[in-house]
Amino acid sequence: DVNVSDYVYMFKKMQFHNHQNLGYEQLPKALSKDYDTESTWMRVPENVVKVYRGLIQVNENTKMVRNNYYEGVCFALKNAARMVTMTEQEDIGVITSANALELAFDTSSDVDIYFYDKYVGGLGFAEKIYDNMEDIIQNAVKLVKGCGCKDGCAACVGDYRLDRQVVLFGPVSY
């Protein structure tokens, strides 16, 4: 069991009839949801942590993180887990441990990826993910490898700026 705190800082404005993106708007006060739910986790291999931390770029002025390949891995694993659990985007969450982006940590410090139910008390999705973890990892590899894009896109790794071969290095290393 885990305690999850979800925050919403902004929202996307869209037209109803064609779903055209009209921009984003910052909320005056963040919306939050705090709940206990079920989860499972997997440890990221040490060699993957070393590579991914070595590629992180931080803009000191804005504190904006670039090249977060953990996000690409989480995106692929979440999509693969959704297929196995027959869930929607809003039913499960996938996130890395807080130390994943901390460059001050030793590159050999453990980084974990957590899968959790987005419902109070959980609905058993995390347990099903645990039971099918090997299949989920293999499906994530197939999703990323099988994409027709050249480098990476919103369909396979979630962000076109991420190199899909580097993202693929994560799940292949399990």
What residue spans do the PLM features occupy?
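Extended, highly charged accessory segments
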Residues: 1-174
